[in-house]
């Protein structure tokens, strides 16, 4: 099931967006080791500027442009799970020995139905270890619109939003319960409701007792 998409231009657009959870991404950083960050969207200047302060390998892979997200596939197009995993793996095109510390998923999960999301998570698995954490954005329910934005991270508690430059792809709702089931090895350890109905998620492997899986709404 899809839900209503937001208009491409918003009368109340505000570029800066406060985050209560983005700072958690940096709590496990070890200053003597290189940080590997995967950003699923296009390279945004705020993200580049922030991570320039770290010993960091910053990888931008804009998966929003994948044909799989267009919703225009033929009705008889039914790839297997493994074929979808292989397509995502090819799109990621990561070196075999890559281990990611931080995944910036932004609102990418909202553009994948359950089948695609499972395949994407499986394709990412070889590059994940016990310390990997992630950040994502969603909507609380189908009555909330998902704005057509792109994102960067400006500082530890502030994101920067950019108006989307292309027509918004089809959007699919995922409740927090469904999302937890679809994310496999990732757990939603913390979630916060934003004033406009969006939700931010902090994801981890669930191996660290200091992160408690307790939604606040």
Predicted regions and their residues:
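Class I (Rossmann-like) S-adenosyl-L-methionine-dependent methyltransferase catalytic domain
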Residues: 1-29, 34-37, 44-92, 133-217
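Local beta-strand N-terminus motif with an aromatic residue
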Residues: 34, 99-100
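Gly/Ser/Thr-rich loops at beta-strand to alpha-helix junctions
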Residues: 43-45, 110-111
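Residues at alpha-helix caps and immediate loop-helix transition turns in enzyme cores, especially N-
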Residues: 47, 116-117
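A short SAM/SAH-binding and catalytic strip from SAM-dependent methyltransferases
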Residues: 100-116
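A short glycine-rich, Lys/Arg-flanked "PGG" loop and its adjoining helix->strand segment in the class I
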Residues: 118-133
């Amino acid at each position: 099931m899809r839900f209503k998409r937001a208009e491409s231009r918003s009368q109340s657009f505000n570029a800066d967006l406060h985050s209560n959870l983005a700072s958690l991404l940096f709590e496990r950083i070890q200053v003597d080791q290189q940080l590997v960050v995967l950003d699923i969207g296009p390279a945004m200047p705020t993200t580049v500027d922030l991570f320039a302060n770290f010993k960091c390998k910053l990888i931008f892979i804009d998966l929003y442009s994948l044909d799989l997200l267009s919703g225009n596939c033929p009705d008889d197009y039914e790839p297997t799970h493994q074929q979808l995993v292989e397509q995502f793996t090819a799109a990621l095109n990561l070196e075999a020995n890559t281990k990611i510390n931080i995944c910036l998923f932004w609102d990418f999960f909202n553009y994948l139905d359950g089948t695609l999301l499972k395949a994407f998570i499986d394709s990412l698995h070889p590059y994940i270890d016990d310390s990997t954490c992630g950040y994502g954005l969603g909507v609380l329910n189908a009555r909330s619109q998902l704005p057509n934005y792109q994102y960067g991270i400006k500082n530890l508690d502030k994101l920067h939003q950019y108006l989307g430059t292309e027509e918004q792809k089809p959007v699919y709702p995922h409740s927090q319960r469904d999302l937890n089931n679809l994310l496999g090895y990732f757990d939603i350890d913390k979630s916060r409701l934003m004033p406009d109905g969006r939700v931010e998620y902090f994801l981890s492997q669930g191996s660290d007792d200091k992160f408690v899986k307790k939604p606040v709404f």
